[in-house]
Each structure stands twice: as C-alpha cells, then as structure tokens.
From Swiss-Prot:
Positions of post-translational Phosphoserine modification: S42
Sites of the Glycyl lysine isopeptide (Lys-Gly) (interchain with G-Cter in SUMO2) crosslink: K68, K78, K141, K152, K160, K190, K199, K206, K220, K285, K302, K396
Residues modified as Omega-N-methylarginine: R95, R97, R99
Family: Belongs to the eukaryotic RPC4/POLR3D RNA polymerase subunit family.
Protein name per Swiss-Prot or TrEMBL: DNA-directed RNA polymerase III subunit RPC4
GO biological process: defense response to virus; innate immune response; positive regulation of innate immune response; positive regulation of interferon-beta production; transcription by RNA polymerase III
Single annotated GO MF: DNA binding
Record key words, sorted: Acetylation, Antiviral defense, DNA-directed RNA polymerase, Immunity, Innate immunity, Isopeptide bond, Methylation, Nucleus, Phosphoprotein, Transcription, Ubl conjugation
Record-level GO cellular component terms: cytosol; nucleoplasm; nucleus; RNA polymerase III complex
Residues bearing PTM N-acetylserine: S2
Subcellular location: Nucleus
This protein's encoding gene: Polr3d
Record-linked Pfam families: RNA_pol_Rpc4
Coiled coil ranges: none
C-alpha cells in the first residue's frame, strides 16, 4: 500500500511527487503540519469557519434524580447516649455533686402530665417509685356557673332600695362630747334598789279581826355565814353609767332653768353682722394721690370713697356698742322669746346642738408677741338672734 499526499491523491508509481511550496498557499490559512510517517492527519486539522463564529452544538439537558435522605436515628441516639454518660461523669467528680435543679413554672398545667417520680440510688442506677406509694393527685376546684336567671336576680337585689342599711342604727351615747374634768360630768351614779322593803309582820290583834287567842310563835334564827353578813351590810356600789341624750328644750324653758340655778352658766349668743345703733363719728379725709401729668409734672388728685364703702363704714357692729346693758329679753306667754335692741326686735331661737366640747377662752396679747389665755367655762347652749321682718315692715309703713 502506498502513502498518500496531503490532498489524498495516490502517488505516482514512477517516483515521489515534490511538495507544494508555501508561497502557493491561501492567505489566512495555516499551513498543514508536516506529515509524520505511520499516522494519518486529523480531520479537523484545518479551521473551516474562516474566522467566523463557532457553530453551536446541541447538548440535551438530563434531569438528575433526587433521592430523599432518611433521618439517621441511630446516630442521634448514639449522641444522646454519649451526652448522658458525659453528664454522669461530671456529676460524679468535683464539689457539689448531685445538686438539685429547680425549674419553676407559671402554672400547674404548664408542665403537662406528671411523670413517674424516680429516686436516684447510685450514679448509674435508678429506682422506680411506683411501688413505694401512691402518686400525687391534684384536686381542682370546679367553678360553679351561674345561670341567666340567677344573675338577673342578683342584679335586682342590688338595685333594690326599699331596705334599711343599718337596722340597729341608734344614737350612741359613747359619741357624746367629753367634758374635762370628769368629776363634773356626772357619769357616776349610785344604784339603789327600787324594791320596797318588806315590813315586819305584826302578830298583834286588829280591830276587824275576831278575838281569838293565838299562841305566840317564836322563829329560831339560824347562824349565818360571814360572807352573807358582809353582803347584807355592804353599801351600794357606785356604778358607771353613761348619761342620756340631752332633751330638746325651748328658749323659754332654758331661761327659766338658768334663773333658778344657783351656779352661773355661759350662753353663746349669735347676733347679726349689722346692729341697730349709732356708729362712732369718724373724720372722713379725702385720699390724696400724686399722678404724673402730660408735661411731666406731678399733680395731686383728691379721691373720695364710693357710696358702698361709706355705708360699710357707717354700719354699727358689736365692737362699736358701749359697755353695759345692750337690750332686753322678752318672754311671751306663747313661749316666744324676743330681744329688743332700741326700736328693733330680734327673734331668739335655739341653735344647732354641737357634738363637740366648746369652751370660752379669754386671750390677752402682749407687746412682744406674748399673751395669756384664760378658760372662762364651758359653753353648752347656743342662741341665734335673727331680725323680725314683720315688725320692721310695720315700722316702715308707719
């Protein structure tokens, strides 16, 4: 078999054909590699694209099959076992081994169903406590659910107002005002037996009785014990009693009682702000004030008081009255009490009783912020004086 040339033509039998020179090759083509004896040249030895874009080749997309991996349970079990062995070794060495760990929960249902309690014997052994005793039972209190009728009935009872809140509410004598000293308050009384003493039986004959000879009967007295004799001879003890509530007394009755009493008593008399009488004369002087004028000079201006201010200054008060007798108290047959202040009549009535202790105190002030206080006595009753408008209107019409 004969060798072929680069064009693939058979060689002449006469002799070897000379090779083409490099000058005759096409421009842009790479020269063919020299032939090696004993080997054919490659099919893609030359560039057939002529400098263009390479042709795309189709390659099919093969979808790879996914295999689901199963969880490896054996590996996890081995890891947990190793961790347990490691924890046991740690508990066995060092200080504080076997310390109890407390886990606190917020509610009794948070931990779930309770497990069987186990007691640790040694490091590696556990003892079941099921045979030791009964398990703990949690008693849960059942809540009672109210029906709609019960709730409506409760609301009706709350809305009712036809009952008495305090049925035993009475005036308590312990809330009475305390008066000092206690010796004068009259809280100590003597208890005397109200039972009438038994009169001695007289066996003598009466005029109405029939004349019959009755033999004299003598009663033998038995000796008494010392305790019984001491009880009979003992005087009545002074018992502590609370005084009763004060009686509602009119002004006329109060004045009669005070007139018959030997001891004097103080009364609180409330008078109006303005009293009938002549106010003291006052020198009314105009008030001078300096005002700066437009020219910058100071000008003195006299200012007089308003009419209301002058009327207020002309009013008569208790401090303006002279010492001595101020008026007269009149007690009518009907029980009405009036106070005459000049030509003005004032009605006198009882004031509201106070639940606290009142005392009249005289205060004397000194020059250097010092003074003296003197208690004059207790004030028990209060009288209120109000103007009689009917008499005032009648006097005005006249």
């Amino acid at each position: 078999m004969s060798e072929g040339n680069a064009a693939g033509e058979p060689s002449n039998p006469g002799g070897p054909r000379p090779l083409l020179s490099g000058g005759r090759g096409l421009i842009g083509r790479r020269p063919a590699p020299p032939l090696t004896p004993g080997r054919l040249p490659s099919i893609r030895s030359r560039d057939l694209t002529l400098g263009g874009v390479k042709k795309k080749t189709f390659t099919p997309n093969i979808i790879s099959r996914k295999i689901k991996e199963e969880p490896k349970e054996e590996v996890t079990m081995k890891k947990e076992k190793r961790e347990r062995d490691r924890d046991r070794q740690r508990e066995g060495h060092g200080r504080g081994r076997g310390r109890p760990e407390v886990i606190q929960s917020h509610s009794i249902f948070e931990q779930g169903p309770a497990e069987m309690m186990k007691k640790k014997g040694n490091w590696d052994k556990t003892v079941d406590m099921s045979d030791m005793g009964p398990s703990h039972i949690i008693n849960i209190k059942k809540e009672k659910r109210e029906t709609d009728e019960e709730t409506k009935q409760i609301l009706r009872m709350l809305e009712k107002d036809d009952f008495i809140d305090d049925p035993g509410l009475k005036n308590d004598t312990r809330n009475m005002p305390v008066q000092l000293p206690l010796a004068h308050s009259g809280w100590l009384f003597k208890e005397e037996s109200e039972e009438p003493e038994a009169k001695p039986f007289s066996a003598g004959p009466k005029e109405e009785d029939m004349e019959v000879d009755v033999p004299a009967v003598k009663v033998k007295e038995e000796p008494r014990d010392e305790e019984e004799e001491a009880k009979v001879k003992a005087p009545p003890r002074a018992a502590r009693k609370t005084p009763g509530l004060p009686k509602d007394v009119s002004v006329a009755e109060l004045l009669r009682e005070l007139s018959l009493m030997k001891d004097e008593e103080l009364l609180f008399l409330q008078l109006p702000d303005t009293l009938p009488g002549q106010p003291p004369t006052q020198d009314i002087k105009p008030v001078k004030t300096e005002v700066q004028g437009e020219d910058g000079q100071m000008v003195v201006i006299k200012q007089e008081k308003d009419r209301e201010a002058r009327l207020a200054e002309n009013a008569c008060t208790l401090a303006d009255l002279t010492e001595g007798q101020v008026g007269k108290l009149l007690i009518r047959k009907s029980g009405k009490v009036q106070l005459l202040l000049g030509k003005v009549t004032l009605d006198v009535t009882m004031g509201t009783t106070c639940s606290f202790l009142q005392e009249l105190v005289s205060v004397g002030l000194g020059d250097s912020r010092t003074g003296e206080m003197t208690v004059l006595g207790h004030v028990k009753h209060k009288l209120v004086c109000s103007p009689d408008f009917e008499s005032l209107l009648d006097h005005k019409h006249r």
